[in-house]
Amino acid sequence: MKYLDRIADKMLRLRLEAFGAVQIVGPKWCGKTTTAMQQSKSLIKMQDPDKREGYLATARTKPSLLLKGETPRLIDEWQVAPVLWDAVRNTVDERNQKGQFILTGSTVVEDKNGEIMHTGTGRISKMPMYPMSLYESKESTGSISLRLLFDDPAYDIDGLQSDMTVEKLIFAACRGGWPASLDVTSQEAQLLIAQDYVNVICDEDISRVDGVRRQPALARLIMRSYARNICTLVKKSKMLADITVEMEKTSMPTFDDYVSALQRLFVIEDVEAWCPAIRSAAAIRSGAKRCFVDPSIAVAALGMSPRSLELDLRTFGFIFECMCIRDLKVYSQALGGRVSYYHDRYDLEADIVLHLADGRYALIECKLGSREIEDGAKHLLQLRDLIREKNKTEHQMPLREPDLLIVMTGGEMAYTREDGVKVIPLATLKD
């Protein structure tokens, strides 16, 4: 398969220039190892079945031997031997050179045995990686740059068009951003990747992540409940009640344990609330918005197909929002981006608040169809006006006004409304 350029490529190059080592973290199958291999000069795969035991024996006795090789040296699935973390850190200190190692792994390491003595602060830079955005999978036209939207107030987007119909967006969400799915000819086979991903997570990885035996059936129920409530503010107690209909003895601590394991596997990645001081704390919703790292996980967990989603556009609206969140995380990485949401008791909301490292931010609503654009724009303008009203009385620490108001759509044409709200099809965006 020909390597498709990733937005992470540039991020990795910059981090290798700045740090002695880079740790790439993210869900399995999202392309971490393949991306790292484009810039590494030597490689060791810790999970190679023919060499694993020998590698582990070496790690126990003299881990520095595993670090010998041309640099940058890629250590794939390093968490198999957590002691390698300190070995990398010490070697970086001794060599005092940049770009020595790349570490990849698909789990957050729980160091129960005390094998990691030090953090990697200043030596090992952590770089998140996600499944492919629509631009990386060559489906977004990339005619609208997220960076330019922030940097250039006069940036003209009017008339720029997406090549993706709603049907194509639905298929892309069902297939997901898994690189392996793009190396398959038939659409039926492409859809199997996400389905198999969910099976592997539930049957194997959820127990393997920390060595605690967990029930695949319960893992499936929890993922299905999450999928039913994707991009909503549903409480854990409601999801637990949903699950106990089929598994009566499931407790909240058990539910929390499974969700925590799925978070360590980078499967679940909830969206936190944005709570600016524009209303009383009690008026602003502060619970997490339920989200997967890729929309295809929700589709597979629900057992849905492109056809069933075409007949249920209400459900696809939530899955579309998950796809918007994934792509915005990818596109905003170089800008230090992070996402949150806003929702208050008066039903004033912004589906996504995209924050940049320098303090700039965008309020974003995700609306699949053109009929919903007016409603989305209305919410954004009301929220901006609320911030302005608050600033009239808050002179010491005024809240920054949003730099952008955007309605992300599944439509085909981009334009700027007279009120300044930008209407942007998801499949026109790039970084």
Language-model features, listed with the residues they occupy:
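N-terminal pre-Walker A segment at the start of P-loop NTPase domains
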Residues: M1-R13
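Hydrophobic anchor at the beta1->P-loop junction of P-loop NTPases
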Residues: I24
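Conserved lysine of the Walker
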Residues: K32-T33
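Short glycine-rich substrate-engagement loop in P-loop NTPases that contacts/grips substrate
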Residues: L43-P72
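Conserved catalytic/switch belt of AAA+ P-loop NTPases
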Residues: W85-V109
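Interdomain motor-coupling "hinge/lid" segment immediately C-terminal to the ATP-binding subdomain
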Residues: E115-R228, T232
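Accessory nucleic acid-recognition modules appended to NTPase machines
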Residues: L182-R360
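Domain-level recognition of nuclease-like catalytic cores that cleave nucleotide substrates
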Residues: I406-D431
